[in-house]
Amino acid sequence: MSTEGSAVDTLTIEEAAAELERLAKEIAHHDALYHGKDRPQISDADYDALKRRNDALEVQFPELIREDSPSRRVGAAPSVTFSPVVHARPMLSLDNTFSQEDVQDFVASVYRFLGRLPDQSIAFTAEPKIDGLSMSIRYENGRLVTAATRGDGTTGENVTANIRTIAEIPNELPKGVPAVVEIRGEVYMAKSDFLALNRQMEAEGKQTYVNPRNTAAGSLRQLDAKVTASRKLKFFAYAWGEMSEMPADTQFDMVQTFKDWGFPVNPLMKRLNSVADILAHYDEIGLERPDLDYDIDGVVYKVDSLELQARLGFRSRSPRWATAHKFPAEQAFTEVEKIEIQVGRTGALTPVARLKPITVGGVVVTNATLHNEDYIKGIGNSGERIRPEDHDIREGDTVIVQRAGDVIPQILDVVMEKRTADARSYEFPKTCPVCGSHAVREVNEKTGKMDSVRRCTGGFICRAQATEHLKHFVSRNAFDIEGLGSKQIDFFFEHEDASLQIRTAPEIFTLEKRQQASLTKLENIDGFGKVSVGKLYTAINERRSIALHRFIYALGIRHVGETTAKLLARSYGTYEAFAMAMKEAAPLSGDAWNDLNAIEGIGEVVARAMVEFYKEPRNVEVITRLIEEVTPQQAEQPVTTGSPVAGKTVVFTGSLEKFTRDEAKARAESLGAKVAGSVSKKTDIVVAGPGAGSKLDKARELGVQTMDEDEWLALISG
């Protein structure tokens, strides 16, 4: 199922969960191509829009954040060609903003998190976002010792020999610098050097390069440093990793210090004191962009004070104190050749517009998701009109397609002047195109309104749903069975021989045994062989013991992504405890139900979906057979060395005065605590500020430890 194209607030939670699952896989694929192989298949604007879409969905549906979410990941795993380097401090990416309103929201979030009033000015830096390859360069006692790419943010590739060939990067620093210095910045190729290189390649009859960014990245990953040296790469310093001493206390002054040490820094960087100044500088840089000798794709804003940066801290993959304001993408006109229906794992029928191929910003676009029948008619999920009444999307229509923001590719509108007289309104099917079952629109339990998604009622008799469930089960972040991909699942599902059929998950693990007693041998079938079949059985057997969160995620419970599965595994510890809790929570009341809802990140909609899943006899029957074949491992509990609150569940209540609630939560979680929104038997500590009410009363009633803010600060500081 696919839903990219409509505003996130028009999506149901089911649509959002399915789209987040797909986005995680798609972005991971492009990360591997971009960061690991320097061979992107889509433009930066297209990639940014996918990330933007993912982030927007997670803001709207925080309970659906997945463990493999792009918001929890940076880049891609490092190549095996170069030796790995573990970064002393992670190299995180930045959140993106795409409009003035986004920038205003970012600045407001900084003030809000810090508890600052608008008249309590906070300075920001603003600098061009260089379109190159991120690099971390480590100096010890003033000498360059290691240079590493970002990689996945935790581990990069050792490219020290190649970095030494870049003339702009000093091999030695001046006397008096800290003993350990890690300079971070961007390696890039100047436009003029790129054009000169391509002219040289043409003269030699060789294939030319696509763009400066890919050329720079490929040049830096040469096994022969002489090739790198010939490419005239350049560098801008703008950040740091590990520093044994801090030479300054602001972002701006740190960068100026790097300049004093001999590193090139961007001359367009400014220190500014208001949103208006920030946006004005964005416009100024945008005007200068065509004349710059290097590619940029936006402007980066950072809180200037390092003390405030420390207070703001980090999200899973990005700092709260910085954002990248991206430049806008492009639009184009094309024709809707056909509207097709896809059926997803949850049965949702999603219309897809097949477009006459059109190039938008250097990338060929051939389709766009239309989300649901209301969207085709120009109506949002809340019933509001998102296009004029007669601007419904029809086959043969000329439409405006955009690749930017949180909707890529998105059909913005219909060009009515080009609509032909024979264009007919699209009739959305009332039956599933795969199995023929009725397709109905359900009542949204969260809003009480009719969902815009139409869903097949066929369940597991629907081939599309059943095969998608199996593909989800064996996917990379679930059971991850090598050799059992989409093509193989289709083969086993459709086969008529009982010894080769796989139509439910347990049958994956009985395949080898069934084959032993069968005359129809898998190894004799085209596409398989004795060696590959042996490897498949080995891969299956290696998954008979599986991490609990992977097992829960693999079940395919609606709304339960990887993040939720990990929260559940950590909270319940064993599958037996988890399954018992789901059974006891069936009445949607009582301690088990309350405990489930008290888990941070588990909302009522998600909790209800989990309980309903375990109420379905067929699901229980399949899981029972599955447990006979596999063993979910006991979940490992996170350990934060030296933290007195590691592993404890903490609830904050009342009006906090020493810190904001967001700041308190972030600090507690950084120390290994779990922050819950309600008090239960599993709560360990309740921190009560002035005005604490029912939560404090309940804590005392349950005998939970309570303390005020000063006692809490003393505890975590000790």
Curated annotation (Swiss-Prot):
Enzyme Commission number(s) from the entry: 6.5.1.2
Function: DNA ligase that catalyzes the formation of phosphodiester linkages between 5'-phosphoryl and 3'-hydroxyl groups in double-stranded DNA using NAD as a coenzyme and as the energy source for the reaction. It is essential for DNA replication and repair of damaged DNA.
Binding site for NAD(+): 44-48, 93-94, 127, 150, 186, 302, 326
Location of the BRCT domain: 640-718
GO BP terms in the entry: DNA repair; DNA replication
Catalytic activity: NAD(+) + (deoxyribonucleotide)n-3'-hydroxyl + 5'-phospho-(deoxyribonucleotide)m = (deoxyribonucleotide)n+m + AMP + beta-nicotinamide D-nucleotide
InterPro entries reported for this sequence: BRCT_dom, BRCT_dom_sf, DisA/LigA_HHH, DNA_ligase, DNA_ligase_AS, DNA_ligase_CS, DNAligase_adenylation, DNAligase_N
Cellular component terms per the entry's GO annotation: cytosol
Keyword terms of this UniProt record: DNA damage, DNA repair, DNA replication, Ligase, Magnesium, Manganese, Metal-binding, NAD, Zinc
Residues annotated as binding Zn(2+): 432, 435, 456, 462
Protein source organism: Rhizobium leguminosarum bv. trifolii (strain WSM2304)
Record protein name field: DNA ligase
PROSITE patterns from the UniProt entry: BRCT, DNA_LIGASE_N1, DNA_LIGASE_N2
Family to which the UniProt record says this protein belongs: Belongs to the NAD-dependent DNA ligase family. LigA subfamily.
EC main group: ligase
